[in-house]
Amino acid sequence: MDASLLLSVALAVVLIPLSLALLNRLRLGRLPPGPRPWPVLGNLRQIKPIRCRCFQEWAERYGPVISVWFGSGLTVVVSTSELAKEVLKENDQQLADRPRNRSTQRFSRNGQDLIWADYGPHYIKVRKLCNLELFTPKRLEALRPIREDEVTAMVESVYRAATAPGNEGKPMVVRNHLSMVAFNNITRLAFGKRFMNANGDIDEQGREFKTIVNNGIKIGASLSVAEFIWYLRWLCPLNEELYKTHNERRDRLTMKIIEEHAKSLKESGAKQHFVDALFTLKQQYDLSEDTVIGLLWDMITAGMDTTVISVEWAMAELVRNPRVQKKLQEELDRVVGRDRVMLETDFQNLPYLQAVVKESLRLHPPTPLMLPHKASTNVKIGGYDIPKGANVMVNVWAVARDPKVWSNPLEYRPERFLEENIDIKGSDFRVLPFGAGRRVCPGAQLGINLVASMIGHLLHHFEWSLPEGTRPEDVNMMESPGLVTFMGTPLQAVAKPRLEKEELYNRVPVEM
């Protein structure tokens, strides 16, 4: 590269951001306050790894609605229930679009799925499909045996680990047992296939499935800082071949499974799995192949890690709070007894279990900043100007810990949800683990049912305690960085069987 070209690049790097900053001051109006951005990088160097905590700290300093600059892109973050209502209800339609970076643009085939689609005819059509066909009470009930099967498989796995010779009283990594049920459940619901046998061995398609998921995560995490600075992207071009290969591999596996189901439809008729529903409804809803594949993988990415995260955080709170654990076990013994396993039909008679689920999701929402919204027009939030094209995030982690709304917000106390009937599926803006408005998670009830079932079974079958010598305050309750927030340190706990009948610890397999 000769000297004149180097000089041109250097001048561009300096002058373009200064010019843009001047133009922004003139056209953007009265923006929310926030930390002073650096030239070119914006606030990227100031953002701490665990963003929900970082943004809460900034909200305490600058106010409940703040401006955060990701390079040259503006993101507005709100941190109170009142402002969440402004974003997700009062300005819902104007803020219903999704920002797509170069990676999500390619993964979603320019928003042909649901999660990354802009609000418009395509989104409305696919959302209608989800609400009227895929996540109906009738379909969720029809698929209940799969969920109950996989939860009993989890119980069997924990029991084997806890009672193996030499393991009595030894801690186990709880997440390992949760991941198995989440993987099997979502693949069976979506594809109608169990890729794992009774011994925990994964077949060839299952290994390919896991490889595709892991590759997608690696590719998405490999984006450079140029992703946030549009005028530098020519210096950091995407590896288009990498995305092309990944998508082709994903599509090839998905289409093979769809073809298998098409064959089974002819032989035995339609079932209730999501792939069967999409195949049956493809013509009625005018679904492209890209949309069918995108919807199936939306369900997988949205439902796998979030379930594990939610249950692991709940178990961490329960081993740190023996009073709550004992109270829940007393309710389970009273309603379910000690001679059978819990069923989802028991939920209506288990209010404390429901309160435990709600309190766990209040303190530890698996997606603490939700997915970003994008302004399709100029709007006002909290009296500030939000320009068209800006991203807007709701810090639901901070909203649910607001001391102005919640008494003793950091205390784990499920009783608060017995004292007041608080909805967690989007109608009460004080607690929003599934979002609200046009972008609320369509599978919220499915997620709640699975989390409640897993927690209920783990507490009904076992007493849980911390490893010897570990105090409640010793458990690391910090989150890991990322869009979804696992526990930074995987929970280790000791499981002691509490039901007398050994057969209650066996998996109850269901073929469907």
UniProtKB/Swiss-Prot annotation:
Keyword Oxidoreductase: yes
Topological category with respect to the lipid bilayer: Single-pass membrane protein
Pfam families according to UniProt: p450 (PF00067)
Binding site for heme: C441
One GO MF term attached to the UniProt entry: iron ion binding
Subcellular location: Membrane
Segments crossing the lipid bilayer: 3-23
Disulfide bonds: none
Domain of life: Eukaryota
Record-level GO cellular component terms: membrane
SUPFAM superfamilies hit by this protein: Cytochrome P450 (SSF48264)
Primary localisation category: membrane
Alphabetized UniProt keyword annotations: Heme, Iron, Membrane, Metal-binding, Monooxygenase, Oxidoreductase, Transmembrane, Transmembrane helix
Family: Belongs to the cytochrome P450 family.
Name the record gives this protein: Cytochrome P450 98A1
Species per Swiss-Prot/TrEMBL record: Sorghum bicolor
